[in-house]
């Protein structure tokens, strides 16, 4: 009884729990079973009574009552009649909420095709029937008949007949000899009569027999769809609809506006259209109207249903009264405003407020200031409850009155309510998880939220009018999570790189830096101080200043915690900072006995965090913030115009450079250099001049000056202090103020040759000002584009990585990646220690000299290990990586390594995919959109020579050198490398040297660090001869294949190979140079081929015919100009290009095997290159290369697998196919890191690896074996492994496949979860595909769970699920035990066992 009463008052049925969602095509019976009645009239509501019309689109009899528990005519009212159906109006007395759940239907007079299955490419109906979409449409829209049953006539099945042809056929064969139908009925018949099993069997036979690729592809597509239908239990004829479902009326509401008009959902218009046409068609059929009229009506019905499902997909868009296209059912789901992204993935919340933020320096790190007014509003329900509990009010109404009057007791209660109740602060745009953090509110007067200065970096907030939103976590669980996980004190480290993010900035840095300055000849120099008390005393009496050099005693503790002290040479300012350090044996005074620049402060905080833990760090940060502010204020640092110092040498440097540019101009006029070279040189010269002036200026600013009167050191230049400490401003900005503004870019990204010589202190001339506006405007335009692009990149990354969750502790993988330091132009940009910190070692790491184990296999590499590794100079380390992790549905903790935001091993349930996506996407807005190029000079300056980065002995790998006529060693090999070995013979560095480089060292020479090893001309690529002899030209015909180009301004000629294929006469020329001996015989090369050198277009000839050349002499050169002026994709577009795995425009051609290059017969205008393998068991590989491309290999060159045949950016797919997963991973990681490194952004490699792992989830089946897949199918890697294991156990033939690389968009759309894919992009296509295949979504990822409204399977949500599973298992055990109740002890033992597991 009791239960029933409860049910009366809580009519909500408990939510159903479910584990998966399936989508399939609805059969007519299914649609009928959903429906509560047929809709026969197009009417909506009666405009006078506002009551819904009977049998109309809002009919109360079908859909339910309008008011709770009240029938339409008003005969039955109130709860007591629940469930009764009124005999007068036929409405069931129940909740009006059922109008959101009950569906209706429309019985169609003629079948219509469902547009999704017809038009969503590839057309499912078309593929099944093996007809083209055009033909099917002709049948559906009543243009042609289709033969469904040819009988004994000469007609073929599926043959289309026009009206006349049909009439002729009827005359010829008689009407009952064959069947030809028209319209959707015809397609319905064809689909209904399909025997899918038979078709599938036939297709398999055909597949085995056919050889042509195109046919195979077509058959495979068809077979796939047939199998989908067979597996899912869908019937093909269900794609033709006889009944249209009508969605519940409250989901397509009709809202009365004032003035008697109505606002309605577009769906009602679309449904009305369908009902009108359907009713008209029924009437026409009853009246036996002429066929042509009925046919026309049927066509219109088909169009109406098409528009309802997907308006605008076919034919004209149906528009409403205001000429705006009507929103169909598909549009309701699609895009940013669709159901998925607008309502399911992001919902609006109540209990939130927003206001402007101001700084709150007196707050503690875990606090924020909340205006009283705001708090009162946000915590209302809590206040009402507390007022009631304390007896101040007996009803909610009274409580409301008290709060409105703002009585004093309300404020007291507000204080109680707010205590220990965290609130969430959020600043838009929330680019990473630190954009929402929890704080404890403290009540303040005023209307602005106070924010702690140290969390500004995380929120990217400043106080120039930014606003923030406040959210109140209501439930106990929410408060708990906010406090334990989201509290600002728990977010000290940056999830992207593990560096502290709670770092003082600006004023605080300036104050701390000022404290740490050392000055000479200050009063009291050399005094000794025993403790801080004495020092304070001396400071207050001005015996010493903050910057005096003194000796001071610093007290700390040893390992046992006993106090120890030591005397340091330091300054009073540094002693004050040192006082704040936590007392710990690992935190010495040295870390603050140095210049406190922002970097050093960050290192200090990091050090304290690693050794003293979180609590100490938070207290320490708060203290140094206070100290920084106090001393920035006391120091009184400010700057005036005179602080910008213009170097005295500026005029001279400018004059010298102007002289240089005039000289280049002259050289150009004399024809010694080309226009492009002149441009490069001029831009280069000005670039150098700017740098020189900057150096001079900085030297002036840095210089220490003494006051001649007092002899004391003058105060440091304040601008220099600000910039050097990292508080504000950069060298670049100072250069513009006090040096020279330098070169400017045009909007196109080119550099303007004439620089801006003035600086802002001197003022710009009108011309200079005009030139500088270019760059400024481009910057603004770029910023707007950048934000949108960066946001879209983040969205794609999150989508692809959302289901990468830590799901187990150790997957036991035996494979991993090899980490090496990244060297760029001889500089180490990322040391090996930085790269392996916080990763798990795959093999034991051994000391190279002693052989002792530094890190055991399977242990995480910590800071202390990194020190040893760096000292031992280990060059490569094998580590575990998420890329090679073998966990199914997720990643394991061992492969991932350290959780960067906490500095501890990663927890189970951490959503590492989303964190990776945020870490890569968040700095996106800092990347450039297009890179400015200093005319290619910036790259050139540093890439024309090679210096030794270590001391050691030289070894040449693949040595192939000759001495040319100047007596220099010249590199002749294409894959030669210079190795530098240390005294133990270990490789310290490997440098590739390009063909044609001049070598300054030879085998076994010793080199010093910084010694030049080799140099080359960065602007051209040489073609050199290996033999001595006389030059002769072949096919170098003037005007056809060679042109004498005279530089128009100089008159000097040079001979250039031109595109000889452009004229018909030159099509079969092969321009080349040969080297002959005195007798005129062609010489042989060392490899056995002729000394013939093929020339490509744009080669410049360096010798005349008949000239005598020695080995190593350049006979022609290919200018690299083209590669240089071309804008290399940089910044954001480059990152997107890599993640989308696009093939670059002119991508490199990579050799697939080791072997020798041979030239084959040319094919049209392509060159055929054959690589003959060294190993005879492999087939030779052929490549076709466009003839005009600069091509540097010669006949007979030896080439290694993975080497470039044609230069360019390699396509990632090629790297994967040729060199394997590890090479691909290192390529992608390095390339992406390069872009971020240029911007000074630190991102840990593991984030990029997680994303790349998601891109490599699929394999393409090559051998299907007994797997049941078709070659060419894309299958999950781990799924295939599992199937193969099962097949091997059963003794069947396993399948095999090659890994495929998918771009992030493609990979997101191919996730096993259709819900996730549909909410990402191409909603219609994804849902159509899923419905045909009857896909099941097992709700593994985060997105699917958010959409269906469950806890996400990560973090606490994942834990809850696990606990629930354990509980269910235990319950079942107990139930079993009760059943047996014979006192069996096994179940008890199991129970105890399970409890223990759960506890663990």
UniProtKB/Swiss-Prot annotation:
Cofactor(s) the protein requires to work: Mg(2+); Zn(2+)
Function as written in the Swiss-Prot or TrEMBL entry: DNA-dependent RNA polymerase catalyzes the transcription of DNA into RNA using the four ribonucleoside triphosphates as substrates.
Matching CDD domains: RNAP_beta'_C, RNAP_beta'_N
Family: Belongs to the RNA polymerase beta' chain family.
Highest taxon of the lineage: Bacteria
Pfam families documented for this protein: RNA_pol_Rpb1_1, RNA_pol_Rpb1_2, RNA_pol_Rpb1_3, RNA_pol_Rpb1_4, RNA_pol_Rpb1_5
UniProt entry keywords in alphabetical sequence: DNA-directed RNA polymerase, Magnesium, Metal-binding, Nucleotidyltransferase, Transcription, Transferase, Zinc
Binding annotation for Zn(2+) 2: 811, 885, 892, 895
Residues the record lists as binding Mg(2+): 462, 464, 466
Free-text remark on how the cofactor is bound: Binds 1 Mg(2+) ion per subunit. Binds 2 Zn(2+) ions per subunit.
NCBIfam families the record matches: rpoC_TIGR
Chain segments annotated as transmembrane: none
GO BP annotations listed: DNA-templated transcription
Name by which UniProt lists this protein: DNA-directed RNA polymerase subunit beta'
GO terms under cellular component: DNA-directed RNA polymerase complex
MF terms in GO: DNA binding; DNA-directed RNA polymerase activity; magnesium ion binding; zinc ion binding
